[in-house]
Amino acid sequence: MAIGLVGRKVGMTRVFQEDGASVPVTVIEVLANRVTQVKSDDTDGYRALQVTTGEKKASRVTKPLAGHFAKAGTEAGRGLWEFRLQNGEGEDYAVGSELTVDIFAEVNKVDVTGTSKGKGFAGTVKRWNFSMQDATHGNSLSHRAPGSIGQNQSPGKVFKGKKMAGQMGNEQVTTQSLELVRVDAERSLLLIKGAVPGATGSDVIVKPAVKA
């Protein structure tokens, strides 16, 4: 897994290319990601880079976390995130060092992970794109009903993962291979073509695309 950055979704706008084409972009504000811990096989059983970003009032930081940030010599951030490291990755980073948008200077495609907008309780037609049943022809009650959810006494249960009505959205979603239109190092911004998961103001993780 490649090293990425944690940012905040600012909103959407558009930029114009040299040929005059209008490109819709999502603006991601990426404040410096501070390394709080470098995990290793010997001590943690796996290799990873733990980072934080932003700031948090001292009164809102728990004592264990306050001690963790103090040990790293960094200011308390709004959360902790990890990036798994492959062989040879992350050797240039030490506790207290910073990651900025400059690491995307030569990247063209990115994967963006965020928490999708919650849509509340939704039926199967809206949530899973089920087809509706007949509007007439004798159907008076089951227009949007899901239909059968199982078999008979054997197996005698509804299988796990069955698509049914329930909470829609508010789950971790990754959108892959989005074009990175611009890296604004001066204002710590990433401009990514198209929409990314999550509401305005939510945290997102941006990484080089695995399928690029």
UniProtKB/Swiss-Prot annotation:
GO molecular function: rRNA binding; structural constituent of ribosome
Short name of any one Pfam family annotated for the protein: Ribosomal_L3
InterPro entries xrefs: Ribosomal_uL3, Ribosomal_uL3_bac/org-type, Ribosomal_uL3_CS, Transl_B-barrel_sf
Alphabetical keyword list: Methylation, Ribonucleoprotein, Ribosomal protein, RNA-binding, rRNA-binding
Post-translational modification (record): Methylated by PrmB.
Family: Belongs to the universal ribosomal protein uL3 family.
The protein, known as: Large ribosomal subunit protein uL3
Protein's organism: Idiomarina loihiensis (strain ATCC BAA-735 / DSM 15497 / L2-TR)
Taxonomy of the source species: Bacteria, Pseudomonadati, Pseudomonadota, Gammaproteobacteria, Alteromonadales
